[in-house]
Amino acid sequence: MFHRRIVAPKDRDSLKRVTPAIGHLTDLVNHLKGRIGEAFVEALLRRANYSVSRVGREAHLPSLIKAGPTTYMPDFLAWREERNSGSSGSTQLFSIVAVEVKYRRQPERFLTDEAPKVFDEAGDHWPNFCVVLVTDNPEGGCSCFQVLRRDQTRRVECTDIANAGFDVYSTTAAMFSLLLKQVFHSLNEGVPAEGIGN
């Protein structure tokens, strides 16, 4: 026979202690937005016929227990076959991109303060490296997905994902942006307005 057991808290105040302080809640929500942003970027790349493999530090157990400095690891490696027809027949070539995904509510702060450091860390190890900056607060008619690359003069350039050479259609970027905003809006509902930042 099945018995249902109800467990009551020892005192009424114990439930109040479950709710984290605003700062901790904001950090948690921003972390969730970052992980959700990674999933959206992975889906966008797969939709553009890329194969995607997670290679970031979180994906490898040895890096979780290793002490000391480690080589920079992007979140994903994305690749797809590019047909190259020449005089000797078609050759199989692959376009490979190292992708780091960053969520920021205020993308302009990331561009000025953090992006150069990220590119300095990654540039030596990953020649075809880009950052996809995910935001729920895009400027003008831009999508929520901005691709950052460093040019020959070491200046960081920002381009909408629909114009970044990944073959992501602008309608797809707009559809994913709308969905992302709805998901992030739901997360924001749980955080008081003064706690939303980053």
Identify what each model region corresponds to.
Residues G89-V156:
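Catalytic cores of nucleic-acid endonucleases
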Residues P9-G68:
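Acidic-basic catalytic patches of nuclease active cores, encompassing PD-(D/E)XK
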Residues L64-K66, N84-T91:
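Intrinsically disordered, low-complexity Ser/Thr- and acidic-rich flexible linkers and loops
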Residues F2-P9:
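Compositionally biased P/S/T/G-rich terminal and signal peptide-adjacent segments
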Residues Y72:
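Beta-rich catalytic cores
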